Amino acid sequence: MSNYFNTLNLREKLDQLGRCRFMDRSEFSDGCNFLKGKKIVIVGCGAQGLNQGLNMRDSGLDISYALRKAAIEEKRPSFQRATENGFKVGTYEELIPTADLVINLTPDKQHSKVVSDVMPLMKQGAAFGYSHGFNIVEVGEQIREDITVVMSAPKCPGTEVREEYKRGFGVPTLIAVHPANDPKGEGMAIAKAWASATGGDRAGVLESSFVAEVKSDLMGEQTILCGMLQAGSIVCYDKLIADGKDPAYAGKLIQYGWETITEALKQGGITLMMDRLSNAAKLRAFELSEQIKEKLGFLYLKHMDDIISGEFSRVMMEDWANGDKDLLAWREATGKTAFENAPKADGIKISEQEYFDNGVLMVAMVKAGVEMAFDAMVASGIYEESAYYESLHELPLIANTIARKRLYEMNVVISDTAEYGNYLFSNVATPILAKEIIPALQKGDLGEPTPAVDIDNVTLRDVNDEIRNHPVELIGLELRGYMTDMKRISSQG
């Protein structure tokens, strides 16, 4: 097998990268009826597998779980999750042959094995589904010609897929049909019904491509969504301790600060986040964000280039073959950082506004990171809608995982693919920030409010205009209009 994207000519690459259409709600008037009465078998019962299955069952679909024989016999967590929720569970041999749609929701590194095991068991003309296209695009998996291959990719962790559905809403979702596998022309109908069954049509669905989903997803998770939050957490905590701040206070400011700050992003983009600051702090955050862009801009572009070329996937799959040696070493090192081991902040109260006032550097990191990730994707041929969802939109959801159990929780919730990319980025970004940004900080940048200064009206006007007119803000204003029922996700209350 070879990287599918690299087998395409330039015109085909640009076409696939640029596949992005926000679908009208009227296109989902039939809901998930296309899949009703069909047998749907999910392979894998992790966060996405379980929660998508729960939503689909509640939408009236026939859902069961195919697990490896050993997982059933040993009553592994996947078996327990499925059975405790009342699902039918069976081996591949028992369930796959009668399935009309098999959905592969196992980790990326298991996909090739799953495909080789289930493909001989699938009946003629069945469909095969993914929620991430890595196996098709980066591994270059060849699927039987009679099988329809589709994707429905919710843009958030599996737990949020369920919670949003339970409250009558949903999460934005990308859907796609693999152009090499749509023999009956039913792929889009299957993908639409699947997205509707998980609640995606209530929040907005983008018709995309496997290529656009993979390349944008990898870029977002490696840089702003995970890598920047990890690097920022480490250097900000270390700086607070160096300045003599109470370790418990410092830990809480960082742990819950990302979540509080990015909640403003969810409701009103970078503009609202910056508007939570005083005028003096806003100008300073803008200045810091420009400095961060100057120091880290090359790294964002390198990650984008390595994702487009397939170099990232090649290196990561080498680590897969080596027993995840690098991944496990980096995971262990993260667990030993000072931030991860900061004392609990029992009894320490930090108001919502204090997170902004004492976290100006963190606000600057978010602004710079979102804009750099968005710009790098768009410059590489990815449409603005996709770039928005993979940079700004998902950030509050990832920040929420840090609020729960710091970096450990973030790296547990995200995929191994995202975790590996996160370490590649943060391992380089952390020392750059520590050397180039932290030593030049001023009083009020982190850990205490920005001192009041005289404000020049023209300067403030120009900064406000620049913030509000960045392309990520313009497309975000449009897309958030489709998500009028977004709730707060704060774990703090």
Swiss-Prot record:
Binding of Mg(2+) 2, residues: D217, E390, E394
Q: Where does Mg(2+) 1 bind?
A: D217, E221
Please give the InterPro entries that the UniProt record associates with this protein.
Answer: 6-PGluconate_DH-like_C_sf (IPR008927), 6PGD_dom2 (IPR013328), KARI (IPR013023), KARI_C (IPR000506), KARI_N (IPR013116), NAD(P)-bd_dom_sf (IPR036291)
Q: Which residues form the KARI N-terminal Rossmann domain?
A: 14-208
Q: In which pathway does it act?
A: Amino-acid biosynthesis; L-isoleucine biosynthesis; L-isoleucine from 2-oxobutanoate: step 2/4; Amino-acid biosynthesis; L-valine biosynthesis; L-valine from pyruvate: step 2/4
- One Gene Ontology biological process: L-valine biosynthetic process
Detail which positions bind NADP(+).
Answer: C45, G46, A47, Q48, R68, R76, S78, D108, K109, Q110, G158
Catalyses: (2R)-2,3-dihydroxy-3-methylbutanoate + NADP(+) = (2S)-2-acetolactate + NADPH + H(+); (2R,3R)-2,3-dihydroxy-3-methylpentanoate + NADP(+) = (S)-2-ethyl-2-hydroxy-3-oxobutanoate + NADPH + H(+)
| Residues the record lists as binding substrate | S415
Catalytic residues per the record?
A: H132
What Enzyme Commission number(s) apply to this enzyme? Answer: 1.1.1.86
Q: Which Pfam families match?
A: KARI_C (PF01450), KARI_N (PF07991)
Which cofactors is this protein said to need?
Answer: Mg(2+)
Q: How the cofactor binds, per note?
A: Binds 2 magnesium ions per subunit.
Q: Does the keyword Repeat apply?
A: yes
UniProt keyword Repeat present = yes
**Broad enzyme group:** oxidoreductase
UniProt keywords (A-Z) are: Amino-acid biosynthesis, Branched-chain amino acid biosynthesis, Magnesium, Metal-binding, NADP, Oxidoreductase, Repeat
Task: Family membership, please give it.
Answer: Belongs to the ketol-acid reductoisomerase family.
Tell me, what does this protein do in biology? Involved in the biosynthesis of branched-chain amino acids (BCAA). Catalyzes an alkyl-migration followed by a ketol-acid reduction of (S)-2-acetolactate (S2AL) to yield (R)-2,3-dihydroxy-isovalerate. In the isomerase reaction, S2AL is rearranged via a Mg-dependent methyl migration to produce 3-hydroxy-3-methyl-2-ketobutyrate (HMKB). In the reductase reaction, this 2-ketoacid undergoes a metal-dependent reduction by NADPH to yield (R)-2,3-dihydroxy-isovalerate.
Q: What is this protein called?
A: Ketol-acid reductoisomerase (NADP(+))
Species assigned in the record: Actinobacillus succinogenes (strain ATCC 55618 / DSM 22257 / CCUG 43843 / 130Z)
Lineage of the organism: Bacteria, Pseudomonadati, Pseudomonadota, Gammaproteobacteria, Pasteurellales
